């Protein structure tokens, strides 16, 4: 994956400890298979792995970034602002097509950009949360229109993706019951819009420090908010530093798994 200037976690020349990566991947796979969801495992794309090393820019792939799903069989293939990553989505589209999913793409001549990591879709509430850093507003609106959502909530920031500063929380009935966000990393108008949204929906907004998200230029965060929300579960990499999150999740009947 190419290095982004707005992702402080990416450093030139840093190589992950492969033994730890394999252990963590194995643990995550076992966990996912224990949850009430269907898990599909795929091999690392041969094309990306075997490409000329002088040209190759992919050591890993964030699958979540490659498409946006309406959770009912339709997938919008990401149109990346970073052109070097587009091949990832191209390959993923082939895989999704082979699985029988409906895949659609933003027209090539459109200026809209939309990346999977910039979205959270809550189908039971017909709400689409969208970032506007790697996305642009036109891309967020294109996805919202394609999914025919009732409400689009755009959060502008300089953070790499929305999933590095925000996550929705959904209960066992797949209903949106809270949101967790690092509002200090968002633009003022986006914070105000989010506050109005939660007030209208009568749900809780837990404001977390940058350390629970992507962090700042001076200090890398722990990415606790970088979660996979599932009905009744919130799966993430680590516990939140904020002491407000755990009590709320317990009250809502949502299990936080790290």
Where does each model-flagged region fall?
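The feature marks the mature, well-folded catalytic cores of soluble enzymes
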Residues: 1-258
């Amino acid at each position: 994956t190419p290095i982004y200037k707005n992702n402080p976690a990416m450093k030139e020349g840093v190589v992950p400890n492969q033994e730890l990566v394999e252990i963590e991947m194995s643990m995550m796979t076992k966990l996912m298979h224990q949850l009430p969801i269907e898990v599909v495992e795929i091999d690392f794309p041969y094309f990306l792995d075997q490409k000329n090393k002088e040209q190759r820019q992919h050591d890993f792939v964030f699958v979540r970034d490659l498409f946006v799903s309406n959770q009912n069989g339709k997938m919008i293939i990401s149109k990346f602002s970073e052109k070097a990553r587009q091949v990832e989505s191209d390959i993923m589209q082939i895989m999704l097509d082979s699985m029988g999913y409906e895949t659609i793409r933003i027209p090539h001549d459109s200026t809209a950009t939309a990346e999977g990591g910039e979205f959270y879709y809550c189908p039971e509430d017909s709400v689409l949360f969208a970032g506007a850093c790697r996305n642009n507003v036109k891309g967020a609106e294109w996805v919202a229109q394609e999914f025919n959502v009732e409400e689009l909530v755009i959060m502008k920031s300089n953070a790499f993706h929305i999933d590095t500063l925000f996550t929705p929380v959904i209960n066992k009935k797949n209903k949106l019951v809270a949101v967790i966000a690092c509002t200090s990393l968002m633009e003022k108008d986006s914070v105000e819009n989010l506050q109005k949204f939660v007030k209208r929906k009568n749900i809780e907004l837990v404001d977390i420090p940058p350390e629970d998200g992507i962090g700042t230029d001076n200090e890398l965060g722990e990415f606790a908010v970088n979660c996979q929300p599932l009905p009744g579960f919130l799966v993430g990499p680590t516990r939140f530093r904020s002491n407000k999150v755990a009590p709320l999740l317990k009250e809502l009947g949502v299990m936080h798994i790290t």
